[in-house]
Amino acid sequence: PAPVIEAYARKVRDNSLAVDLRLGAKQLAGLTDPAARIGALGRIMARLRDGIPVSGHPLDGIDLMNSLEAQVFGLAQRLDVDGGSISRADSLALMKSLAMAGYGVGLLTRFELDNIDASLARLDQDQLPLTEYSSQLAYLGRAPGWASRRLAFYFEQPIARLAQIEPLAETFIPDRMRGSPMIFYSRLLNPLVVDAMQLAGVRQQIFGETVGTGLRSLNPGISRGVLLTLEQALAREASTADAIVIVPETISELPVVAGILTENEGNALSHVQLLARNLGVPNVVVANPLLPRLERYLGRKIFVAASRGGVVEIRLDEDAPAAATEAQGPVEKISIDVARMDLDTQRLIPATELGPEDSGVRVGPKAAEVGNLTNKFPGQVSPAVAVPFGLFSHALTERRVTPGGPTLFEWMTTQYDELDTITDPAERDRRANEMLATVRGWFMQRPANAEKVAAFRQSLRDNFGPDGSYGVFVRSDTNVEDLAGFTGAGLNLTVPNVVGEDNIIAAMRRVWSSPFEERAYGWRQSIMNDPEHVYVSVLLHKSVNAAKSGVMITADVESGSRDYITLAVNEGVGGGVEGQAAESLLIDRNDGTVRLLGSATAPQKRVLLTTGGSERVPASGLPRVLTNADIAQLLTFVERLPGWFENMPEAERAKAVADVEFGFLDGKLYLFQIRPFVENKRASRSTYLQKLDAGLAENADRTVVMAERPGGQR
């Protein structure tokens, strides 16, 4: 292709591009070795992509790029990319070239390529520790997922439309990946990862087959259950508590399940993910090429083990090791100290009057911490008021379910007692669902107390202004969340950007009833004593039409190191917590170094409307969402967080990790919520999971010679 490259170089308007292309063509013409030619082509393709916008001949440039990609594909087919005959160092050099080619054809962004290069640079040594070798290979395994998600950003919505008339349209993205330089990148990486696992004495398995790439542990844990798709789980009449569910990476709600298998990358900081992590529900990311192997076993009972060190086993349940059936210890149940609660206060409380001492007393932890943020970071928290537990409690007791009958609270207590005596699971589920429907109906339909409604309206005007002049997020805030053993993240309802007093009152009814939805009840019920003592406060938080928003954990979520923060952020409002494919970053708190974990590839973003509600509009798809200035503001905020959670015991408070929801508008940081980041300890106590990781510790000091082939041969 050298003459074709030179011909294009003669046409382009940008002199710098022309010089670089001619030099690249000259180098290419003098090479015969396939690997060396792939290296030269990768460099030319990367430079061509950067230069096409200023070339003056973009269509010809794209035609040339397609021709060069075909050359790379043909050359790579001549190499033994997955046979293990190429040395570790040469394999990594080829991966670098293929990543540049992937960048050239638009599958990777410059930020993604820079992060791949940085990881490869850490491996560019004569020898290095096994731990470094393994961790960098694991990081490099993210790149094919980035490429797949970049294609999804551009083509996911058109594919969904076309698939209605031609189902084969759904195969476009995997087909494009198989025809791209990234397929050879993956095939080179796989034997290296298998090599690292063999050196460490561990292996990843899916139904008896050892795999290098394609499985990544998000949450540690052990589960056994029937393998279902999300559609099958949602259509199931019986409980899904015994199901292991294959879910799309963008899911925002999930019924109670035993285990989660997430397609492609996933969002490690979404509400669903944080809830699963808190409850010890294992979650494994499964790359697209492995999904067909999973789908063969739909409807069968399987076993999933995911260790803290990232080792994953997926087997048929009948093939599960006997040692894996061990009990992981009893589930710690939550008991509510009702005596400390203030169930009498019924006036709306401005956030400026709230603090940590009110959490679980007058209001839930969400409102209490928003009050704390309001007072300590003035100007960075939008105005808010809380509807206290007292209003909800009075709604339970001030009227009777039937004339002369019990109050709703008394009726619920009787119902819960009766449910405890039912041994048949199906009958218990049926009765529970009937009870929950009755409670929801009570809140949605009961006549309002005119005097209380008038006081409520006046309080809204005093705190927010005239009716219709503002919007609020109406957020559930119960006494059964952000506790030591249960976060409850995302379980109950938030109604976004409600405009108008009548609409706010209607949203209040929905929020009060939301803890009695089957999904919230299912996740909560198994870990709670005295379930009749669920009380709901409501946070009314003035809307901020954020340009970007996300979630921050003040630690490395994977390792637990407090030297880092982990971020997931999207354009628009709420994408990070909803589970959209987010920009995920790991940031060093000491020097601000940024490491990319995943790019924001959701094709749409949510924006708020002045009339209420929101709409989805196209996202920009820019390579980066957070700017360096944004990151600097977040790091400054984090510096003030040590010792934040005043209700914790002193020893725990000093090392507590925070889970923060935030946004940016006009370059300014806004704070929406802060809670403790709570992980489940049962997985760390499992001797079987410890055994899976044993080789990692035993072989941590091994040295890897990079000139050798995978397996240790020269």
Language model: regions and residue ranges:
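N-terminal beta-alpha lobe that positions the nucleotide/phosphoryl donor
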Residues: P1-F172, G221-G225, A287-L539, L626, ...
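Conserved mixed alpha/beta core segments that line enzyme active sites in large multi-domain catalysts
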Residues: P174-L294, G299-A305, V311-A323, E353-N375, ...
